[in-house]
Swiss-Prot record:
Name of the protein this chain belongs to: U6-lycotoxin-Ls1a
Propeptide: 22-25
Tissue/organ expression: Expressed by the venom gland.
Any Gene Ontology CC annotation: extracellular region
Signal sequence extent: 1-21
Keywords from the UniProt entry: Disulfide bond, Secreted, Signal, Toxin
Organism whose genome encodes this protein: Lycosa singoriensis
Post-translational changes noted in the entry: Contains 4 disulfide bonds.
Length: 75
């Protein structure tokens, strides 16, 4: 019984450490790439993605942290 309680306590402590580490990770600033971590832009920013084309051929998707209330238009 003691072993079961000890194991449960260890699992709870490990879970809390992981959550705290996730909350402390650095956010991605304005106009930096967020393709691999779309939910990690700093406060007031959103991760917006675009499909990239080179000479009419799709070359993948790239995402950038941009301001939430700003809309960008192609030139």
């Amino acid at each position: 019984m003691k072993l079961l309680l000890f194991t449960a306590l260890v699992l709870v402590v490990i879970s809390l450490i992981e959550v705290e580490a996730e909350n402390e990770r650095a956010c991605i600033p304005l106009e930096k790439e967020c393709t691999k971590t779309p939910g990690n832009c700093c406060s007031g920013l959103k991760c917006d993605c675009y499909r990239r084309f080179e000479q009419g051929v799709a070359k993948g998707i790239q995402c950038w942290c941009i301001e939430e209330d700003v809309t960008y238009k192609g030139v």
